[in-house]
């Protein structure tokens, strides 16, 4: 296993943000991505939830691919799915939304499983997934890929996701929380 963020010889404390930053560096150097997510230095916590949601929707509206970085603690186990941000962000990215004369279509969808703090991925098969995540894995619309595989060939996984997006009518895409 090789990842610049994980060494098999030492315990490495990383965050989802560190993986996002690594992905962005690599993707931008390859010229294949424009990032529309939250910046590391961006704090929206002082805003009302409605304002945050509007900002997220504006960013998601004209995007093409939704990457979801799956980590051991991405789901808050004692909160209902409908009270968590991640399923709503995924749902909005999959819905067709019209503003003025422009319609945003379903995004391509990739789930990237991050290694845990010990560099392992086995937690993923044991975790309870959001319904929208599980549904789009089961129907084949979203691909699940380990971080080390994804980061080694970003363009391949993006191309595969875009191909599935073109074939959207062939899938029963789960679009609701």
Summary of predicted features, one role per range:
Residues 1-65, 104, 171-176:
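Conserved N-terminal substructure of TIR/SEFIR domains
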Residues 1-6, 115-177:
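C-terminal interaction surface of TIR/SEFIR-family domains
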Residues 7-12, 81-84, 124-127:
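Short, glycine/charged-enriched secondary-structure capping and boundary segments
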Residues 65, 90-91, 107:
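Residue-level detector of short, conserved catalytic/binding motifs and their immediate flanks
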Residues 68:
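Redox-cofactor binding/interface segments in oxidoreductases and associated redox assembly factors
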Residues 72-73, 97, 103-120:
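Short beta-alpha junction loops
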Residues 73-99:
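Conserved TIR/SEFIR loop-to-helix hotspot centered on a Trp-containing motif
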Residues 97-102, 141-145:
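Short C-terminal domain-edge/linker segments immediately following a structured domain
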């Amino acid at each position: 296993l090789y990842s610049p963020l994980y060494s098999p010889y030492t315990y490495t404390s990383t965050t989802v943000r560190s993986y996002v930053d690594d992905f962005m560096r690599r993707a931008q150097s390859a010229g294949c991505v424009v990032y529309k997510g939250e910046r590391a230095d961006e704090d929206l916590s002082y805003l009302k939830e409605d304002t945050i949601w509007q900002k997220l929707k504006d960013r998601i509206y004209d995007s093409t691919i939704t990457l979801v970085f799956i980590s051991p603690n991405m789901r808050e186990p004692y909160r209902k799915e409908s009270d968590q941000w991640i399923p709503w962000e995924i749902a909005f990215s999959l819905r067709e939304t019209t503003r003025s004369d422009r319609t945003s279509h379903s995004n391509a969808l990739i789930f990237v499983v991050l290694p845990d703090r010990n560099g392992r991925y086995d937690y993923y098969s044991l975790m309870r997934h959001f319904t929208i995540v599980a549904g789009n894995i089961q129907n084949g619309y979203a691909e699940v890929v380990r971080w080390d595989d994804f980061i080694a060939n970003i363009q391949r996984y993006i191309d595969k996701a875009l191909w599935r997006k073109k074939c959207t009518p062939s899938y029963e895409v789960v679009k609701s929380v």
